[in-house]
Structure formats: C-alpha cells, structure tokens
Regions:
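Acidic-enriched, low-complexity/disordered segments with a strong bias for Aspartate over Glutamate
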Residues: 13, 17, 53-56
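Short, surface-exposed acidic/glycine-rich loop or hinge patches that mediate macromolecular interfaces
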Residues: 11-13, 67
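A contiguous, well-structured "functional interface" segment within a domain
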Residues: 1-2, 68
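Mid-chain, well-packed structural core segment of small domains
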Residues: 51-88
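Short edge beta-strands and adjacent turn/loop segments
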Residues: 2, 36-63
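Short, well-ordered amphipathic alpha-helical segments that serve as non-catalytic structural scaffolds
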Residues: 22-27, 79-83
C-alpha cells in the first residue's frame, strides 16, 4: 500500500489535481499495486527558500512496505517522473 506525498511550491503553474493524477497514474502503471491500495495526497507550500536560480519545486515521497526489490523501486520512480515531466 504505497502512500504518495507530493510537496510543491504554491506558485507552481500546474493545477494540484493534475499533479495528484500524474503521480497516482505513474504508481498505477507500475503494476506493483492494486488501484484501491494507492493513496496520494498533495501539500502546497507558500513559504520556502530555494537556490537563487530556482523559483518552484516538486518533491514526491513514496512510502512502501518492505518487500519491493531495488528494480521495482527504480521502475516506480521512473514511471512517476515520466508522468510528471509530461505535465510541462
């Protein structure tokens, strides 16, 4: 049962529902979990500080139970990142 936590800058020019859908679909596409077991939530941060040349951020944490291989985790990460990149 993965718990996906998306943290992002509130100034990000991507609607929150699209961020949640992108991460959720990336996890689902991995075929490692049943759809009913995937939990995804998002938190927007109004106050944050980044490097001088950065204005926005997206940070995704996926919490998993034990038992997933390194290869499973790498594939999961790749799929989620691919779905997020498709938003731009």
């Amino acid at each position: 049962m993965p718990h996906c936590i998306i943290e992002f800058s509130s100034s990000l020019d991507i609607p929150t529902d699209l961020l949640v859908e992108a991460v959720h679909h990336g996890v689902l596409e991995s075929a490692l979990f049943e759809s009913s077991h995937i939990k995804t939530r998002a938190l927007a941060y109004e106050y944050f500080r980044l490097a001088e040349d950065c204005n926005d951020f997206i940070h995704v944490t996926i919490r998993l139970h034990h038992g997933r291989t390194t290869q499973n985790k790498q594939q999961l990460t790749k799929l989620v990142l691919q779905h997020l990149k498709n938003l731009r």
